[in-house]
């Protein structure tokens, strides 16, 4: 059967969903996720895109906080990028924000070239903080442990990823050791980079 569902929720703000031409509402996304959970979906990932050209800080925060209100197992927060062949690429070329083939091989975040966008570094910090808050909620942790114990798929996946998890934790501990020595602050969390 189906083990993982990946929902392209994108935003909790109708104005931004309209900009993306999504033809959905935040409430429809909420209903879809709840329905999938009730139907027995084992792992549900919610994908969100922040950093649209005129998206406000409050709208970005609203989207990040929306993830906490729906029964997903993991949020994937993406910062909107501009890539060749997309409508936004054409829009930005027409506005003169892209010149002579710049970024055609790699693309670029909207927030790095659009003067009306929230700055990239600020969005990145908001996303980082939002993911941290999402995964540190006591209700989230307890539900994930309970789901792990009930799901052979999750147990198998966790066991298969133990070496990877060890590498992530080790990398984090090595990076944080210098920080603790410089600041004298207590260790705050294992998976925050």
Describe every region a protein language model picked out:
Residues 1-153:
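A structural motif corresponding to the C-terminal lobe/cap of the Radical SAM core domain
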Residues 133-193:
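Membrane-proximal basic amphipathic "stem/tether" segments
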């Amino acid at each position: 059967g189906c083990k993982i569902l990946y929902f392209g929720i994108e935003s909790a703000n109708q104005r931004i969903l309209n900009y993306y031409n999504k033809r959905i509402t935040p409430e429809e996304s909420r209903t879809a996720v709840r329905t999938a959970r009730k139907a027995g979906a084992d792992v549900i990932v919610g994908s969100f895109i922040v950093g649209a050209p005129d998206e406000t800080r409050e709208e970005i925060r609203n989207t990040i906080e929306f993830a906490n209100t729906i029964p997903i197992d993991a949020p994937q927060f993406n910062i909107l990028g501009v890539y060749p062949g997309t409508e936004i690429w054409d829009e930005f070329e027409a506005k003169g924000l892209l010149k002579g083939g710049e970024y055609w091989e790699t693309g670029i975040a909207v927030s790095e070239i659009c003067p009306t966008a929230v700055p990239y570094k600020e969005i990145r910090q908001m996303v980082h903080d939002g993911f941290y808050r999402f995964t540190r909620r006591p209700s989230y942790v307890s539900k994930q442990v309970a789901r792990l114990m009930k799901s052979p798929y999750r147990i198998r996946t966790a066991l298969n990823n133990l070496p990877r998890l060890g590498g992530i934790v080790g990398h984090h501990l090595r990076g944080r050791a210098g920080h603790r020595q410089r600041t004298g602050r207590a260790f705050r969390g294992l998976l925050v980079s």
